[in-house]
Amino acid sequence: MPMNRREFLAASAASTAMLNQGMTAFAAVTGNIQVTIDASKSGDPVNPMVFGGYMEPATTSVWAEMLTDRKFANPITDAAPAPAPTNSFFRRFFGEPFKPVGPAGTVAMDTVRPFVAKHSPLVKLGGTEPRGIQQSKLRVGRGKTYEGCIYLAGDTGAKVVVRLVWGRGAGESQTVTIPSLSPEYKKFPLKFTAAVGTEDARLEILGTGSGTFHVGTASLMPADNVQGFHAGMIRLFKEAGFKMFKWPGGNFVSAYDWRDGLGDRDKRPPRLQPMWSDRAEPNDVGLHDFIALCRLVGAEPDLAIDSGFGSAREAAEQVEYCNGSVETRMGKMRAENGSPEPFNVRCWCIGNEMYGPWQYGHMSLDQYCVKHNYIVEAMKKVDPKIKVTVSGASICEKSVGGAEKKGNFFPSIWEPPIAERLPYEFGSVNDWDGRLLDKCVDNIDYLSEHTYAYPDLAFDAEKQLFVDVHDPLQFRARRLANRIGEAFEAWDKYVEKMPWLKEKDIKFIFDEWGNRLRSASGNGGGGFMRQTGMLMPLSYALCFHEMLRHSDMIAASCATGGLRTVLTDNTGEAVGFATEGLVMKLMQTNFLNAYPIAVEGDSPQQLLPGTALVDRGTKPTGSPTYPLDILAAFTSDRKKFLISVVNPTEVGHSFTPKISGVKLRDQGKLYQIAPPDLSSTNEVGKEPAVKINETAQNGLPETVLVPAVSVSLYEFDVA
């Protein structure tokens, strides 16, 4: 008989010693760990959407477009541009702008006859001297073909060529000659094949002759793109087993108008996105494109709507656009844009972090409760079958945000200093989940929780600041899982205060989670881009274990770095899995719809340094098998038995399993990630140092040896 959540967690933690909240000393491991697994005590099936990824901004690095600001949201000027970011991820969004070619004053921004932006480049010709615009720092691969288009208008005396240049020699480029121009914008195809690979190619749009010509927009992509997306990323995301994508944010959504992403891609208006430092958003990835991505990968869409500047009417129209028949006004518009069949989007997130003053359209908690109800009631009037996620925050999420503010982690003159002591109190004006659950409970299906951890920091309750800690690997890796655990502690507190919540089937969606790597002073940062060896993969594995244990309380999750867990070459194409990507693949391809089983042990987990309900809970997370973390489960058909073991230490350990309630066949498999050392990582152009190794097993050993810095998944058929 399935166990309820409290019985399941109580069984899993039966051997865990209760530790004082302020305890910072760690018990030493002695002897072999004794583990008991009772297969008759299984939990609810794991929702496949736990294995999700998160996309922000609207047009992400998954998109194959090579040109920055291709619709000219920003003017082209003679002034020297700001240096382009060196990081390949950010180059895609804040990269090299178009520059004028020719003497000063050659290029003007015409606001009278713009193509799609508020202005378009107007090039003044000067006879035989080539004049126009160019964009540098393009990344091309040897022998790789690139295709695109350009919209041009101009005088008949203008002779225009478009050239892809990959070197300095006369033969180190390829040219497309444009037929004669007309006063009206026309679309011309482009196609190039690069003879060499370089990260400093450039696209030139040049004219000679007399008169002027306008550039409306230009586009260039690898020819092997799949509906506009990088082919390698589609292949690897599908292989990894992503089952949900959240889009278009994140902070991005609170100033995003979904209608900007409809219609002909080249004619969608570009915008300067205020939530991303006025980055030029071309709106190339719109609603239809996002749905196409989900279908290519086999993932469910999770659409975030703008509850900041956006209205209830706009949200309802978006639901009708996605799910309405062609007989409805918005459904007819969807059909006119190429999709007569409804998208049938079921998951909708109402805004993002609306508790934060950094959010466009931020308002007080009492006002937001009213707005949330207005929006959801309007949406469900259109389609009662949709599920909505409230943009709230437990006091844990709010308290971590307060701790970041106290440490000035994200400087802003618009956010007031934090005067209150942390953690915030339940029922206070900072308790967004508490108030929303009280005032909006009939309009909530899921609770959003954004869960970020700092592996090298702990919040000091006395100093009221994050401080540097020098913990062993197992505690650094476990901080993220502890943040997951404290969210469930907060839920239990809400149920205690509002008993009627027991009758509601409200679940969590951890729609942003990950690690942030920095010191208390801010040195050594680099966020998700920093190379960390096996720290991230171990942390991801422990986080998944904790979420799967709470299968009855989680509807979905989205790793913030989930869509960047692939390796990209110097052209931006995905060519393999990063180390954390392998962990996600291992978990996502084995635990879909699995039934977690209670695990007991004789080695309780240890309480981490920090402050309860800020950066950790009041009790440790994980199975009572310290320092190992063990998760057992049946596969969805109950024909296979799984034991997943994470060893987040730099030494080997062993455990003796005692399994009851099921009989296993001897023949089995072991899928194992066990690299040579902690610093092991995968790099482009090199043989992977971290792999998933598969070996046959002849029965589960009486004593299981677990290598250092490893994730091991045993699979046996049920007899």
Model-flagged regions — what are they?
Residues Y151-D155, T193-A195, T589, V646-P648, ...:
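Solvent-exposed strand-to-loop "edge" motifs in beta-rich extracellular domains
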Residues L203, L365-P537, Q605-K619:
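Noncatalytic carbohydrate-binding groove/subsite architecture in carbohydrate-active enzymes
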Residues G53, I150, G241, C294, ...:
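Conserved, mostly hydrophobic/aromatic
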Residues S623-D666, L670-I673, S712-L713:
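Carbohydrate-binding surface patches
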Residues N4-R6, A28-N283, E300-D302, G310, ...:
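Extracellular and organelle-lumenal recognition/adhesion modules and their flexible linkers in secreted
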Residues E7-A27:
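N-terminal export signals
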Residues I506-L628:
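Aromatic/acidic polysaccharide-binding cleft in carbohydrate-active enzymes
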Residues M330-M363, H450-A453, D505-W513:
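Active-site groove signature of glycoside hydrolases
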